Amino acid sequence: MQRNSFSRRRYFPLAAFLVAASTTPTLGFALSPTFAEPANSTQIAATNVQTRAETPTPVAPLVFFDALTPLDALTPQDVKFRRLDSGAVEATNGLADNWPGFHFLGAWNLGDYSALEAKISNPGAEPIQLYCRLDCAAAEFPEGTTTAGLQIAPGETQVWRIELPGSLRLETRAKLFAMRGKPGGIKTDAYSVDAKIPFDKKELVAIRFFENQNGRGDRWTLESLVAVPTPAEKREAFLDWAPEKFFPMIDRFGQFKHKDWPGKTRSLDELRAQIEIEDADLAANQPSDRNEFGGWTKGPQLEATGSFRTEKVDGVWRLVDPKGRLFWSNGVDCVGHWNGVTPTTDREFYFDADVQLRRDGGPFDAFINRDNNAVNNYYAGRGEFWSYNFTASNLYLKFGADWQKKADDLAHRRLRSWGLNTIGNWSAESIERAQRTPYVATVGIGSPKIEGSSGYWGKFADPFHPEFKESLRRSLDASFARFAAEDPFCVGFFVDNEISWGDAGSLARAALASPSTQPAKLAFIDWLRAKYGADVAALNVAWGTTFADWNALAAEPFEAPAAKIADDETQDAAVRTAAKTVAADCDAFYSVLCEKYFSEILATLREKAPKKLYLGCRFAWTNPLAIAAAQKYCDVVSYNFYKTEVGSFRPVDGVDKPCIVGEFHFGALDRGLFHTGLGPTESQDARAAAYENYVRSALLNPWIVGVHWFQYGDQATTGRFDGENYQIGLVDICDVPYAETIEAVRRVGYAMYDIRSEAKSTDETLRADREAAK
């Protein structure tokens, strides 16, 4: 093995950013700070730089850290180091920095390496979420960087494989845009799909391990860090191709042309032969202990109400189906025909000539659209653009003119055979209306927003605006919502998705920063008036402000002082005291606003769909105050959890409320797509194992009543409107099931009720938590 040497330089945090990298028609999220060095810092020394010409054949692993590596090879950032007898280094996080961790600094050419492997342990009693960010020489976050995340359970040791993107020829890479992942495994975050300075592993200068500050002072250990060479047989020739050879890169089925993989569709005959193969497979595999709703026929007979409901049975939260059978919602999102839609405007040269990109009056016109619904990245704000639906066109090629009817029928047969029992969010109405498989419904709120707010998917709807409730009423009066409200196969309603709750107090601050007519702002001022009295003088004393009267506060947008000023010892004591009071008031009204949001929705759902469960808002970015309000009003609280497991999840503040996972997934790069999604794995086998581990962990968690995989089919190789192009389907772009994943889905799905029976009660689980914390 080659050993690495380092040149040390001190880095200090300058800023931190919350980076959405989600998905759903959206996303989960990753945290990635910016690190900057002081102006008087010396330039980095290029120690142990490799070049291809100097690289021996075969390439040896490159050791960054092991038992022989001195601790001064690590640059700490608000952590304390301790060398263990094993040679591993234990890092204990401080509480001062937002991003405690440590860095390896130097200069390396990792062009012949495919991944870093870090052996990490968590000796503590709480799960921890670690991140690894790699910077190239020109890095200025988010440009020139790539970030990976790892959740590690208490007492667990993992070998964390951090994939290194391939080094695609620069002039070819320059023509690739509007894609989160690019050929060779090049990845970008949600805010820089088209980074001006892409990450280049040939110019690596920093490897940064860190955690987001959580106030716990977590401990974690690093035993080894090694760069793994790319096997000669896996080195991809297309990485060196010029544009004129590389393009077009997408075949008639929407697949990447320049690689082969097991299951790739190479002809129409292969596409159509899949029908008979799968029909035989589905007929041979059927779970035996399910009723028409997917409820457990071998379980207890409970009260049958004709609708889905929640009940705690033997100390474990359960869903109960309309016939009174125990039900655990094992589902998949986006069951439909549009997962493979991709924009084609300005990218026509990506596609083979036999992909019809413009309408000509023929049958493929149905798969060509003019869209204008991109909310971020390349196509946002550009007006209308052309798109092509590879999923639907492949179904047409596979089934013929009645492709939609046959594909809908196949979806129901697949889900039952695979051991799934729920059609998740954003699925086709034609499939849900068939009343063959339970489903969840979803509605949104189109009312005016809090103008001072912001968010990846848009501003936050103002729950104090009269239109808030009226907008929801109109959504629930729509044809399908009315159908779902009376349909026994409808489990319940999600309202909204991954809206931006911000930090505690943030929406109250946003209200103050809004115009004078903002209803949320006026409600906050009324709340302050009730606390401080009719005379604004008391507020001025508490907040350190000089408002002439309450109308003056309302008249102009007001930027409340940042909460962190309260803890800034460089500030005057009076300023800090005032900032602390402002923060407390903003937190208090934030809770009022959250309760207004959830209570108005609950009241409207009880009015329009009284038989259905309120399944919450599908939290992705959130905070304890928002969750506390949701737990008060939702029948089931929903989260989009992109993690490796959810067995360690607990409701906030010990509130005993059932929860459901609205999204999770895993992906790999061995089936022709360019991005793994938010749960990266090394291979299809590893992906299947990750799926099974996740679902088992949920089944054994007494609060979790279901999980929904995101999503039914792969995204387009060239990306949807926001650039997501993830290998996250249960089926590929040609409607071929991923055999390894489906085997795992069946294995855990067929056994899920038996596994659920092993879950400890909530009380017993909490007692075990307390014992473990001693």
Give the residues covered by each predicted segment.
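Polysaccharide-binding and catalytic clefts of secreted carbohydrate-active enzymes
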Residues: 322, 332, 346-403, 460-462, ...
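Aromatic-rich peripheral "rim/lid" segments of glycoside hydrolase catalytic domains that contact
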Residues: 510-522, 710-774
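Extracellular ligand-binding interfaces
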Residues: 93-195, 216-218
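Short carbohydrate-recognition loop motifs
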Residues: 79-99
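Substrate-binding cleft of secreted/luminal carbohydrate-active enzymes
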Residues: 490-491, 497-498, 664, 679-730
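Active-site clefts of carbohydrate-active enzymes
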Residues: 387-392, 451-461, 573-587, 655-691, ...
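Active-site-adjacent substrate/metal-binding segments within catalytic domains
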Residues: 256-433, 450-489, 574-580, 584-587
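Glycoside hydrolase catalytic-domain groove-lining segments
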Residues: 584, 588-603, 607-677, 692-696
